[in-house]
Regions:
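A short tyrosine-centered beta-strand micro-motif
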Residues: 98-100
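Beta-strand-rich extracellular modules
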Residues: 103-107
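Extended, polar beta-sheet/loop recognition surfaces of beta-rich domains
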Residues: 46-49, 109-121
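Short, surface-exposed alpha-helix to beta-strand junction/turn motifs within ectodomains of secreted
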Residues: 46-47, 53-73
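N-terminal edge beta-strand
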Residues: 24-42
């Protein structure tokens, strides 16, 4: 009898984990232009594509030149499908190392942050 109750409890716990698993997923970048660690000519447009829809009001990125802590102004927009954030630098980009520092909120309100490093030749 105790063994049967234990089996039912284990099955219920496993079912709860399976149901909760999608809620534990976090917003993350699945593709970027420029790609992480790439060396490129100064990009005219920067794009970040996410694994799930993001909330436009709480999702954007900034462009920072590493070592100088110099921010390059970028006005970002979110695509109609809410999975891609794009932006064009409004100032010239010198040769050197950069980071795309992003923040994105998913539909459940959970905010994530990350960086995509790249170099301009």
């Amino acid at each position: 009898m105790k063994l049967a109750k234990l089996g039912v409890s284990a099955a219920a716990a496993a079912a709860a984990l399976l149901i909760a698993a999608p809620a534990l997923a976090h917003t993350k970048v699945v593709k970027s232009t420029p790609a992480a660690q790439a060396t490129v000519a100064a990009p005219k447009t920067i794009t970040l594509t996410f694994n799930e829809k993001v909330v436009p009001a709480f999702s954007s990125f900034e462009l920072v030149m590493v070592g100088h802590d110099m921010k390059i102004p970028v006005k970002t927009t979110v695509s109609k499908d809410n999975k891609t954030i794009s932006g064009s630098p409004t100032a010239p980009m010198m040769a050197g190392a950069y980071k795309i520092k992003w923040t994105a909120a998913s539909a459940d309100g959970h905010r994530m942050k990350g960086e995509v490093p790249f170099r301009v030749r």
